[in-house]
Amino acid sequence: MNRIYLDQASTSFPKAPGVAQAMMDYLTMNGVNVNRGCYSSAYSAEEVIYETRQLLAELFHFSKCKNVIFTPNVTTSLNFILKGFLKPGDHILVSAMEHNAVMRPVVQLASLGISFDRIPCRTDGSMILEKVEELIRPETKAIVTLHASNVCGT
């Protein structure tokens, strides 16, 4: 029986070819935590992380791979950015389709003097990009948009 999976936008399933095998190889052949020891397996783990940072820095055109940080999940990442970067008087734009992981901290930040506007979306969930430029102000510090919606599939 063929399986149909309809929640692709909210998870990382199914894994790309080779990902599950690479994870299994790491877990069975190394499996140690990074920066926890001075032995060959620990050094191998650090090398994997460093190489991954380098690849991501290249992908995103960062000048230094140390600017790549890893977090447990996207909610933690969003909170680092929103709560660590913005200050009272700042303004951000969020898409009207944003997930609660974005909207809850954004609404909380509004009570601290950080304003936001929502970028309107069409009925199919796609953003009305022409509105973005109209909503940008001198104090706009970030534009937060989702890549794919697990609500409507766009």
Q: Residue locations for each model-derived region?
A:
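Pyridoxal 5′-phosphate
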Residues: 1-154
